[in-house]
UniProtKB/Swiss-Prot annotation:
Its cofactor is Mg(2+). This is Phosphoglucosamine mutase. Its EC number is 5.4.2.10. Pfam families: PGM_PMM_I (PF02878), PGM_PMM_II (PF02879), PGM_PMM_III (PF02880), PGM_PMM_IV (PF00408).
Length: 443
């Protein structure tokens, strides 16, 4: 990856790292590069509910307009809705101003191609060269050639209609608590679930620009877990700031994570004869229980590095229609080109209604192995990862765990080594992790 773009676009503290000046340059460079690569009506621009969204949207739009491309403005909108609208409006590309589940001080800008997929690395690298001044943008249109802003007033209606059409059964009788993370889901998710017949109790659905993801949403589901029990609901749904992921809570107040949601949806699709190529893509961090649950069903599990970008690549390469992460970032390629928390929630509710089972019963189809994850701060990740002592410690741990597994990997962004183990016995699993950490700390 280049100097600006990370695995999920350009991110940083708004107005310090991600400044309006940088947003303008990004808009200008992206519009110039994407205009040459893809035909279309302009660039769809949407955002989440962060206070810095207005500032960055204005600057990004100015950059796009300055190279003669139109801006199709959709306002506050879930990230996956922008991927869909980019396709639906036959746009050149899509741009999202969001930092997803990060704190409100952060923001980010990422782009989708005209087909609604994240941009390939080489396109991001080309955009980067223009932003950093390594290449000069040779055009400066004047007069009638300058771009215009078009307000897409029916954007919410278009996405709502699209999302609702991904399910067949009404949700009447379902009582659902929905945590909108004070983010982009606030204006869309509760309405979609209600219009399909569910009784919806929304919480954290009053964004003020500064409360996005604040002790709420998929990274802080504790309030939702309590609310589901207090309200006597059948389930709870926790979105994050840009609604590209969802976690669920069963009627007893227990968390149902992305691994369990994939097992529930994957098994249902197989039963209905809809699981194309009979395979699913997960990351190395997915719980061992997931692999065992799918093995029992004869479903092939493919593993990738952590990150939805890698999950999507593997899905496209192997013709899989479902893939995702424990965090609730799940891609259902039959419906959308990126992780879509609202559409994932709809498929989950469809299984509950179709099977006539409680979510707690469905979640039991994947018994979770106790998982222990600890981080060790180190000076030289490469040296430690290559050491023979570490390899021996891992082998000893694997022997001790028996049926479990151990994963030791360096962090991609910090000076840390992550040690994760899974096993049938929680106490033994923790002991094994601590023993490996003790070896790392001596190296």
């Amino acid at each position: 990856m280049g100097k600006l773009f990370g695995t999920d676009g350009v991110r940083g503290v708004a107005n310090r790292d991600l400044t309006p000046e940088l947003a303008y340059k990004l808009g200008r460079a992206a519009a110039y590069v994407l205009k040459k690569k893809y035909n279309g009506q302009g660039i769809v621009v949407g955002k989440d509910t962060r206070i810095s969204g207005d500032m960055l949207e204005t600057a990004l739009a100015a950059g796009i307009l300055s190279v003669g491309l139109n801006v199709l403005r959709v306002g506050v909108m879930p990230t996956p809705a922008i991927a869909y609208l980019t396709r639906e409006l036959k746009a050149t590309a899509g741009a999202v101003i969001s930092a997803s589940h990060n704190p409100m001080e952060d923001n980010g800008i990422k782009f989708f191609s005209g087909s609604g997929f994240k941009l390939p690395d080489e396109v991001e690298e080309e955009i980067e060269k223009y932003v950093l001044g390594e290449k000069e943008i040779p055009i400066r249109p004047i007069g009638a050639e300058i771009g215009r802003v078009r307000e897409i007033s029916d954007a919410v209606l278009l996405y709502k209609s699209f999302a609702k059409n991904t399910v067949e059964l009404p949700f009447s009788g379902l009582r659902v608590v929905v945590d909108c993370a004070n983010g982009a889901a606030s204006y869309v998710a509760p309405k979609i679930y209600e219009e399909l017949g569910a009784e919806v109790i929304p919480i954290f659905n009053t964004p003020d620009g500064t409360n996005i993801n604040a002790n709420c949403g998929s990274t802080h589901p504790e309030a939702l877990m309590r609310a589901v029990v207090e309200e006597g609901a059948h389930l709870g749904l926790a979105h994050d700031g840009d609604a590209d992921r969802v976690l669920a809570v069963d009627e007893k107040g227990n968390l149902v994570d992305g691994d369990q949601i994939m097992v529930i949806i994957g098994k249902y699709l197989k039963k209905k004869g809809l699981l194309k190529n009979n395979r699913i893509v997960v990351t190395v961090m997915s719980n061992l229980g997931l692999k065992k649950a799918f093995a029992r069903e004869g479903i092939e599990v493919l593993e990738t590095k952590v990150g939805d970008r890698y999950v999507l690549e593997e899905m496209l390469k192997n013709g899989a229609i479902i893939g995702g992460e424990q965090s609730g970032h799940i891609i259902l390629l039959d419906h959308n080109t990126t992780g879509d928390g609202i559409i994932t929630a709809l498929q989950l509710m469809q299984v509950i209604v179709a099977e006539g089972k409680k979510l707690s019963e469905l979640a039991q189809e994947m018994p979770k192995f106790p998982q222990v994850l600890k981080n060790v701060r180190v000076l030289d990740k490469e040296k430690i990862m290559a050491s023979e002592e570490l390899a021996k410690a891992i082998a000893r741990g694997e022997k001790k765990l028996g049926e479990g597994r151990i994963l030791v990997r360096p962090s991609g962004t910090e000076p840390l080594i992550r040690v994760m183990a899974e096993g049938a016995d929680a106490k033994l699993t923790e002991e094994v992790v601590d023993e490996i950490i003790a070896v790392i700390e001596k190296l």
